[in-house]
Amino acid sequence: MLHWGPKFWRALHLYAIFFSDAPNWKEKYEAIQWILNFIESLPCTMCRHHAFSYLTKNPLTLNNSEDFQYWTFAFHNNVNKRLNKKIISWSEYKNIYEQSILKTIEYGKTDFIGAWSSL
């Protein structure tokens, strides 16, 4: 079975982390299009439906990277709740990605997914 979930989350969280702190309209538009295309490409039909439903009920907040990160954090926790997986706090999320970014910078790689893979 193809385990696409962790790769999806990694891409989504990293996109939000590296999103601009002062995005212009083009960056916001591109982020929205990226999310829509990304959700559309999910290999699981039910997952696509749930993701679009979540997006409709919880529109993206793209004022800055922190807002975008919080949206991805809440989305990930929403999915984890539905799957009876662990829900993490915002501070846990921040710690996970900050450590991941430091590892990425220091070693040129990240274990960002490893931290979330069991969630």
Swiss-Prot record:
Q: Where in the cell is it found?
A: Host cytoplasm; Virion
Q: Cite the Pfam families for this sequence.
A: Evr1_Alr (PF04777)
Which Gene Ontology cellular component annotation is one that this UniProt entry carries?
host cell cytoplasm
Q: Which intervals hold domain ERV/ALR sulfhydryl oxidase?
A: 1-97
Keyword DNA-binding listed? The answer is no
Q: Does the keyword Flavoprotein apply?
A: yes
One annotated GO molecular function: flavin-dependent sulfhydryl oxidase activity
What does the UniProt keyword field contain? Disulfide bond, FAD, Flavoprotein, Host cytoplasm, Late protein, Oxidoreductase, Virion, Virulence
The cofactors named for this UniProt entry are: FAD
Catalytic activities: 2 R'C(R)SH + O2 = R'C(R)S-S(R)CR' + H2O2
Q: List the disulfide bonds.
A: C44-C47
SUPFAM superfamilies named among the record's database cross-references: FAD-dependent thiol oxidase
Q: What induces it?
A: Expressed the late phase of the replicative cycle.
Q: What EC number(s) is this enzyme filed under?
A: 1.8.3.2
Q: Which PANTHER family does UniProt cross-reference here?
A: ALR/ERV (PTHR12645), FAD-LINKED SULFHYDRYL OXIDASE ALR (PTHR12645:SF0)
Record text on subunit structure and interactions: Interacts with A151R.
Q: What is this protein called?
A: FAD-linked sulfhydryl oxidase
Q: Which organism is it from?
A: African swine fever virus (isolate Pig/Kenya/KEN-50/1950)
